[in-house]
């Protein structure tokens, strides 16, 4: 039941009466244990039951309305189309009401409220916040009415005369309410209970009993006008007309009875001097910021007297300090600023406001993302908006409150919540919300719930595949993975990762399955099962693997495993499937119905009472998802109304008829039919904003209300935003685009393990790997549980198959995707005319949207339109580097990249050229990445634009704040579209290095010489330490290209700026670098031609007396002529990449965390070597780089091949060796070692000199010793000459004694010419004997022996006796052998003394 009527003729709910005459104490009674949705249903059931007896009790209507009416002004008039009896009845009652009005005693405030036109149409927070007193008042309505002091006797008599029927009527209503109350009481008892008795979390979606009384009216004022539309979604016009008068009376009754009991209590809209409890009109917003960034929390609170405001972090009170600054402005705006946030600051921040009348609080999660954090960058986008930009969105309202079961303000879930107002609610209701209280204590919160389901994924063979889901539930959670029903065990091929919750306030686990290298046999249905003590849930997704030789990847066109999820369940849908994907297509009041009793576990008996008309017009069919849709098909012939009230609080859509059901078989037939129609269409481009009706149902949508269509750059998005056959869905998507800049769109995903999903966070389109059934993309573009599919045939495989040169105009390719705030400015930025009425749905080709079939989301269409490798072609889920834009997914660019809007040049040749140019830009990387041929479109564009015209857009990081972009702030990624400057994410290792550099720099002295002249130090008011409004990015460029680092710094006084490269300060007078600083604080460092030496970390440090702050950007300079690269690279072009390896590719830079490229760097390298021929030569080197470099060796420019003499080894410690054994003269020369990886190459040279092997010669006696005789006392010389190479060593021996050293009498001599001499001064008889000389070198040894005889001068030798000359035996020279002399060799015949061999009298003897 709606909170307000969609017709100004009668009250549709008690909320209208509550606004008019109910006092504050009335609210808490029933709302303490009933949610708003449950109360809605309660009232609706009661009305339906009462309606059944309306005919018999019709006569009592007049009586009751007379009794309970309060003010003619406060009552709605009967609509012109109401049934005559109702019209007559109410018209006849008005005069009586007017006469009775003054008689009823009312306080001035009540009268003011009742008659105030401003309060008349304010939607109530709850349609039926009934208390037991209200139930009693219904039962006692007759008595109370009779006792009311009323001077008019006529109405009194009439009332008494019809007391019987009226009593029956009241009893019925009271009975129904009591029955429903008892049902809901147990299911919702602790609802809105938190440790402090409140539930004012910004995204809880509920008002706590403590807050409700004072918050009601303001919340009503800010409530989305879509509450008015809920009536059309729940009831058709006939039901309302029949019930109008009855509701009128019931509301009068409530107004009559309740204020009597509660008049003394203060009213929400009383004059300011009356005390009011605190109420937060602007709540805190959860944030996720990078470490070191500034955290800014703000909220607004009202109350009388002015509330006392206190701040808490994780329950610990915070006080004003230099680190945490707490401010209060104008008594309402309270801010908490953390100048520099660290990981320790992560937690739940609560602002508590108290005064004597009560208290209120608001909480938000602040997550400080550390250097190695793996959470999403873009997650914080939804929280960034300027304070006060949309004050209405900050107020309490349940009309668009969607939570996933917990009061945690930020779950980190990747549920894209497109909200009509930028309410600070970043979560989406799952169907389990009815089980779950904000304090997370009930069974619904204990049960596991997937906050992000698995997404259908397609990948190429060899790519990394990552399947990720997020689950919350009471620990311990056991997560299991299955493929085709078989459990998957953790292994190197299938890594199962599970990230535990980062806080108890946010008990969400990230479960990831990583397939390191995918093969076609890995495809199939993957299931993740989460189990705890309270139950288990599963999430399923399909993985499609295409062969490596396929250029294009077709998604599963049926996706039955996912569509079956909804079709095989009984009416209460499973909690895991009624996910947040339902919500975006619903209006807020519809959203409330997601959690309404027809989904409740305790409402099985009552479910059948909600007829098809009501359930389906609510847009929620238990088995068919939201808006009666499956795969984009609508049930019925009536399109849902456009959310006009999103912008205009007074606009109300026409009633919505019930939608008939469609079975899956019929759906499939319709899908095939639409596909066939699409194949036959040429798809002429339509003006932007023309909604598309791709349904075959033959129905036309109602005219669109006047609110701005999406920006002109998104013709496809404007027209194709909804695969639903309804213009209003397109309008809702348009509305969502217009509202995103205020943070209402939250598509958060983890940094790691998301492959090629960049478009999702930027434009709200589901990504090719997403499955709507996973509830991770609850947007109008993915409202159904089936994955978008491709047609079985060729329709979405190659554009050539869809349109050719004969087509009137090629379909506009996807426009550049901007970050949310830039792409979807607030409505006043683009004051466009309202879109024209939708085309007849039967045409099925009004504008480009109809190009994708009913089972396709626009993202599928976009990915199909671009001929490419499989959409996740740049899959790099592990956060490892990527250098190619994901197929079909343009990189984000700034708005300035668009020269003329599509609207301005639609249908012209310029439009075609511009669109083709865009596509070429997005396809450039793919073309250079091994794609063998150009598509027709690209060939055409190159004819029109020239071959070198397509360039890659720079990447705008998601961290860029909406405020900066909307204000036209300088872009963080500098350089125009012609730059090849690409951003990328640094690894955690690099980040630690960067942090270390910054830490040291901020604590080290700097060179002030080249700094700009600063004003002398003067006292400064509001002095603030420097901080970066825009930080440096990390870039990857090619050698020779220009690069610019840009950031923006602020501080008071104006900070000084210093630049460093790898920790060394860069002089402002440097010739290589140009340093600039603008007046707005933008600082830049530019080099026109980068070299390999420019590779490194660039740090900017800003300093003023308040402190220092630094920021670092990594520059990777890649060599141009590395292996596999084309040496030619057109000017301004990103250089072609060499083909990637099978299992890893170097994908797009805007991935959450990419593979990092580090050029090889030699940590160890040998110098020049000289090696003797025949010896072993070993060259050792050590190299670093990422990926691990490949090493190759060259000799004089020629590759060295491994063979028996040349071996290449790698040791465990990473040392590479080239071993040559033995070395020959051919091995001499210049050796080059080349290390190569994807990031570039490096090399070193050395010279090897091979020393020739010497011609070794054994010693040879050229002159031998001679036998000598000498007279006693005379000197004697024993001489010989020996030669050998190398020169031999000489050893002397006398008999068996070695002569080791010279004495005064006996000395040994040797010269350089080989002459050897033994000189004996004054020979004696003892000197006589055999003397041996030996010569030895490496080649051998030789010896020579001679006899010395000493005789007296007077002794005459007898002539008769022949002297005996004895040759000693070899044994006499055993001592020589001991010295290593080869005695046998020494006594070869040629070595023997000639005089011995010639002497015939020579005899062998052992004795002398």
Curated annotation (Swiss-Prot):
Record field: compositional bias (Low complexity): 691-701, 765-779, 1123-1133
Phosphothreonine modified-residue sites: 642
Region described as Disordered: spans on this chain: 69-229, 631-660, 687-727, 758-854, 882-904, 960-981, 1121-1150
Region (Interaction with VASP): 569-573, 830-834
Post-translational modification remark: Phosphorylated predominantly on serines and, to a lesser extent, on tyrosines. Phosphorylation at Ser-1143 by PKB/AKT1 modulates cytoskeletal organization and cell motility.
A biological process from GO: epithelial cell morphogenesis
Polar residues biased stretches: 149-169, 193-229
GO molecular function, one term: actin binding
Compartments in which it is found: Cytoplasm, Cytoskeleton; Cell junction, Focal adhesion; Cytoplasm, Myofibril, Sarcomere, Z line; Cell projection, Ruffle
Name this protein carries in UniProt: Palladin
Species this protein is from: Mus musculus (Mouse)
PANTHER family: CAVP-TARGET PROTEIN-LIKE (PTHR47633:SF16), IMMUNOGLOBULIN (PTHR47633)
Domain Ig-like C2-type: start-end pairs: 278-367, 448-546, 1026-1110, 1160-1251, 1259-1349
PTM annotation (Phosphoserine): residues: 194, 639, 648, 700, 704, 744, 901, 1004, 1009, 1126, 1129, 1131, 1141, 1143, 1146, 1377
Disulfide pattern: 299-351, 469-528, 1181-1233
Region described as Interaction with LASP1: spans on this chain: 653-683
GO CC annotation, single: lamellipodium
Region (Interaction with EPS8), start-end ranges: 782-842
InterPro entries according to UniProt: Ig-like_dom (IPR007110), Ig-like_dom_sf (IPR036179), Ig-like_fold (IPR013783), Ig_I-set (IPR013098), Ig_sub (IPR003599), Ig_sub2 (IPR003598), Palladin_C (IPR033017)
Biased composition (Pro residues): 702-714, 780-797, 807-818, 828-840
